[in-house]
């Protein structure tokens, strides 16, 4: 059966005058209280939306989420916090629930408050119950860019449906000066709040913590899942697998749509002491200028990439350095092949395609640590992303 939309969810999306003339506000709500799991930015400069949403998920139950695209409302002091709280209060009135059961997320330039007169007028004109579940419209509003392809994925797990919408760094409004990552999943599967939170944290660690776009965390990074249980129980192992695959698909989508140009770069690190070490190495390599030089250089040199991998291994006391090998497209490129006359494997990848780099750290003994990071090769478009005001 084709996945459509999970039962018991309603959606509103529209233009609230936040920025531009396109849809820039979305509300996703469950007809009944839903279990919720969420992860947020690790930045100490978290936006008010993150602070309020952390409070909302503390009891493991939520009714909905509101997303404002085009304004991060971060670095705006007490008044910015009050604005975000008012938005949450207005949405709670529409959904007919306690305001602490509403998550809020924002994305866009930092240092500006919401245009509250316009946002307030828009929300006061919305009447509950909300209409049908137009998740494609919600995805477009979350993205907040006219004419862009919404990032949305659907899947099935037994009788339950899962749906996810997302935006990544550089896929948002304000001329791509936005570094936030937002992702929201809804399902009608029945999963307890504690179990759902555990599952989602593992999924987020594998998917969103494997999203390589620089070391700096955004002020508003938010990923959440709501499960309202209307489809009944599901096999939890299968559910985690389906949710994990859905999240990884979204990560790859937002990387491709990031606006930085070039190829999707997937770095798979194996042979590490543990998953933490593998993830640390993978993220460092994806962000390294040496990787981009190797991908695009006329005479690719993978030794600097190996140096980055080795330098972030952090062997520690009692840990022995391994023998690092690097393969691109299945061909070993480090240590350097003897036949340098042969074209490097990476030249087989067209621009806009996908480059897969496999780094084995070669830690002696049993080394089960492995992690995969997705990023892009950051061509000329990327400096424009960092030149804006949003983070």
Swiss-Prot record:
Keyword Oxidoreductase tagged: no
UniProt KW keywords: Acyltransferase, Amino-acid biosynthesis, Arginine biosynthesis, Autocatalytic cleavage, Cytoplasm, Multifunctional enzyme, Transferase
One GO BP annotation of this record: ornithine biosynthetic process
SUPFAM superfamilies attached to this UniProt entry: DmpA/ArgJ-like
Enzyme Commission (EC) number: 2.3.1.35, 2.3.1.1
This protein's record includes keyword Metal-binding: no
GO cellular component: cytoplasm
Main location as per UniProt: cytoplasm
Site features described as Involved in the stabilization of negative charge on the oxyanion by the formation of the oxyanion hole, chain residue numbers: 107-108
Binding site for substrate: 167, 180
Pfam families to which the protein is assigned, alphabetical: ArgJ
Lineage top rank: taxon: Bacteria
Annotated InterPro entries: Arg_biosynth_ArgJ (IPR002813), ArgJ-like_dom_sf (IPR016117), ArgJ_beta_C (IPR042195)
Pathway where this protein functions: Amino-acid biosynthesis; L-arginine biosynthesis; L-ornithine and N-acetyl-L-glutamate from L-glutamate and N(2)-acetyl-L-ornithine (cyclic): step 1/1; Amino-acid biosynthesis; L-arginine biosynthesis; N(2)-acetyl-L-ornithine from L-glutamate: step 1/4
Sample GO molecular function, one term: L-glutamate N-acetyltransferase activity
Reactions performed catalytically: N(2)-acetyl-L-ornithine + L-glutamate = N-acetyl-L-glutamate + L-ornithine; L-glutamate + acetyl-CoA = N-acetyl-L-glutamate + CoA + H(+)
Active site: 180
Localization per record: Cytoplasm
Quaternary context: Heterotetramer of two alpha and two beta chains.
Function: Catalyzes two activities which are involved in the cyclic version of arginine biosynthesis: the synthesis of N-acetylglutamate from glutamate and acetyl-CoA as the acetyl donor, and of ornithine by transacetylation between N(2)-acetylornithine and glutamate.
Record family assignment: Belongs to the ArgJ family.
Name of the molecule in the record: Arginine biosynthesis bifunctional protein ArgJ 2
